[in-house]
């Protein structure tokens, strides 16, 4: 029964995660780019009819991904590797961005709440771009952690109160990226679709290299 529950939650975690990240890419790569060129009537139609429905699936898929992932972490407990820990951290931050920044500001953009739609759109856009930036490193760490050769998917080793240098560098980098999502601005490295995809790929390579080799 315990094994069945684990398999069920792992499948559910993957399924709702696909919905979440798929909609994240839809918003960043398709809808946002379309709205930049759409006629006023078409833009209004998207914001009134399409966006609310898509945002409903988006935010609840994010929350369910988090909940199922939390249960899987509970099962792993001390067996969570450096990759799982960092992947889970990025996933948690991304979920908090969805509910704490993106949805709160998108309610203003789509007219469900009063406020400055331009400023709200900018805040939501920055958080959404940040999630897109973190998405590939998060997916890489979470998906491939169970398939790495023995010796590469290590556990963070604590020595005299400190852990692996690479693990710490990735941890600090993630927190700095999130700090920019909350307090910073849209930099050119994430402003366009091509830029954020490129930056996400580079970040994945850098993060994986730090975790694997700088120990």
Task: Please give the residue ranges for each predicted region.
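Polytopic transmembrane helical bundles with strong interfacial aromatic enrichment
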Residues: 1-215
């Amino acid at each position: 029964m315990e094994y069945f529950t684990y398999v069920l939650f792992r499948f559910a975690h993957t399924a709702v995660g696909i919905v979440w990240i798929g909609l994240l890419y839809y918003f960043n790569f398709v809808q946002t780019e379309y709205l930049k060129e759409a006629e006023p009537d078409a833009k209004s139609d998207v914001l009134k009819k399409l966006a609310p429905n898509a945002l409903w699936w988006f935010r609840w898929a994010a929350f369910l991904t988090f909940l199922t992932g939390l249960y899987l972490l509970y099962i792993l407990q001390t067996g969570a590797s450096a990759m799982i820990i960092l992947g889970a951290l990025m996933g948690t931050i991304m979920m908090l961005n969805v509910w704490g920044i993106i949805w709160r500001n998108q309610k203003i953009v789509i007219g469900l709440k009063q406020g400055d739609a331009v400023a709200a759109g900018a805040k939501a856009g920055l958080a959404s771009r940040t999630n897109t930036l973190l998405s590939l490193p998060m997916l890489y760490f979470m998906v491939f952690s169970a398939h790495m050769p023995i010796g590469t998917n290590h556990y963070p080793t604590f020595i005299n109160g400190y852990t692996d240098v690479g693990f710490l560098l990735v941890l600090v980098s993630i927190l700095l990226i999130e700090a920019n999502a909350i307090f910073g601005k849209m930099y050119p490295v994430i402003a366009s679709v091509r830029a954020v995809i490129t930056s996400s790929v580079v970040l994945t390579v850098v993060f994986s290299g730090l975790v694997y080799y700088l120990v």
